[in-house]
Amino acid sequence: MKRYVFMLSDGTGITAETLGNSLITQFENIQFEKITIPYIDSTHRAESVVLRINQCFSEQGTKPLVFMTLVDPEIRQAIKKAHACVFDLFSIFIGPLENELEEKSSYTVGRTHGVANVKSYSHRIEAIDFALSHDDGIKTRGYDKADIILIGVSRCGKTPSCLYMALQYGILAANYPFTEEDLVGFRLPEVLRPYKPKLFGLTIDAQRLQQIRSERRPNSKYASAEQCRLEVTEVEAMYQRENIPYINSTKYSIEEISTKVLAIAGLQRKI
């Protein structure tokens, strides 16, 4: 079974996507065709979106699902005229909140992902810049400013996790990869030892590591099963010897890896 899913927003669409995806992923036997439409900022644009939704209904004969985060009541009403099952994620919560807080909402578009807080936005940019300039052990100077330093073998999820922590949490995250040369008589590299309290390890199942590396450099020693097993075994042994906290990233998304790392490390959101 296939169902169309529309994620509609008067802003970036990130909130509608996040909430919508969280809900539909609970239905594993249904194939969803997802369509995100951001910046629906007028009734005219809303009407064109309704035409598109109705076309999907006509072609398939089943109502598309619509998850919308639209502030303007007129635009919301326009969308609700579509032949669809509409989930108004804004009005579901804003009414009860107004009652509880005894204050009317400002009904301002784009507050969640806009630049309403300049200080917070600047810190986010600083964190992203830090993650990029301290990626893959490129620059170890500045590690004293890091909130956390992810370490691990190549291709275990360090870079995307650092970028996610920077973007979503404002965390200054660096990462350092262990190379084949590091693994000869493997010990914690001396460049990392002064920052040991900031170190957090990632590991990964050797079989999964081989799959990932084979996509990048097939038929190489780097991607061989033996090399992957050796690196994972040596790195995990070092984590245990040095009492460095670590998690296995194999079955987790980048979002889950980042959240688990921050929770275990005791780091709090900065933005």
Curated annotation (Swiss-Prot):
Positions contributing to ADP binding: 152-159
Ranges that cross the membrane: none
Keyword list, A-Z: Kinase, Nucleotide-binding, Serine/threonine-protein kinase, Transferase
Catalytic activity of the protein: [pyruvate, water dikinase] + ADP = [pyruvate, water dikinase]-phosphate + AMP + H(+); [pyruvate, water dikinase]-phosphate + phosphate + H(+) = [pyruvate, water dikinase] + diphosphate
Its EC number(s): 2.7.11.33, 2.7.4.28
GO molecular function annotation: ADP binding; ATP binding; phosphotransferase activity, phosphate group as acceptor; protein serine/threonine kinase activity
NCBIfam families given in the database record: PRK05339.1 (NF003742)
UniProt function note: Bifunctional serine/threonine kinase and phosphorylase involved in the regulation of the phosphoenolpyruvate synthase (PEPS) by catalyzing its phosphorylation/dephosphorylation.
Family listed: Belongs to the pyruvate, phosphate/water dikinase regulatory protein family. PSRP subfamily.
Name by which UniProt lists this protein: Putative phosphoenolpyruvate synthase regulatory protein
